[in-house]
């Protein structure tokens, strides 16, 4: 699968996951760079959630590291945390967890607002056939 197809698949799965959690409204406010791939708002609670997709190649890139670090540290005007959902292929989950720990984004104490959405290869193959 090409990087473009893999990223599109991860993005679709992530958007479906966010919608299932109630984050259905597109966040329309102008965002500071780097702009997240997905920005949604819960219409009930008004809580903001960002979404990013990470491929195996991205795990080695400094730009990806800086992007994840920046998005994980963002706060609302009222200083509350913004949820960050990261879509990753199942085989790359452990590498991403190690990266998040190394960057001090998510460990035993910090990073409760960062959630990993794992996309299984079987689900990926079934979705592309539809």
Label each residue range with its predicted role:
Residues 29-31, 52-58, 87-91:
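Structural motif
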Residues 90-130:
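Domain-level recognition of nuclease-like catalytic cores that cleave nucleotide substrates
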Residues 33-36, 82:
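A short helix-loop-beta-strand connector motif used in the catalytic cores of GNAT acetyltransferases and
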Residues 19, 42-48, 76-80:
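Flexible, charged surface loops at secondary-structure boundaries
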Residues 61-88, 92-105:
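Short, charged, amphipathic alpha-helix that recurs within catalytic cores of restriction-modification
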Residues 36-72:
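Conserved catalytic cores of phosphodiester-cleaving nucleases, focusing on short active-site segments
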Residues 47-51, 80-88, 114:
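Hydrophobic beta-strand segments of well-ordered beta-sheets in folded domains
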Residues 1-34:
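Acidic-basic catalytic patches of nuclease active cores, encompassing PD-(D/E)XK
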């Amino acid at each position: 699968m090409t990087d473009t197809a893999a990223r599109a698949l991860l993005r679709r799965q992530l958007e479906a996951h966010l919608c299932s959690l109630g984050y259905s409204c597109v966040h329309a406010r102008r965002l500071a760079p780097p702009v997240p791939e997905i920005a949604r708002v819960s219409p009930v609670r008004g809580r903001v959630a960002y979404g990013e997709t990470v491929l195996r190649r991205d795990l080695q890139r400094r730009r990806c590291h800086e992007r994840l670090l920046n998005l994980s540290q963002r706060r609302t005007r009222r200083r509350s945390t913004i949820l960050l959902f990261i879509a990753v292929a199942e085989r790359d989950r452990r590498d991403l967890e190690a990266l998040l720990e190394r960057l001090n984004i998510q460990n035993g104490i910090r990073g409760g607002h960062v959630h990993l959405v794992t996309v299984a290869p079987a689900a990926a193959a079934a979705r592309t056939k539809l």
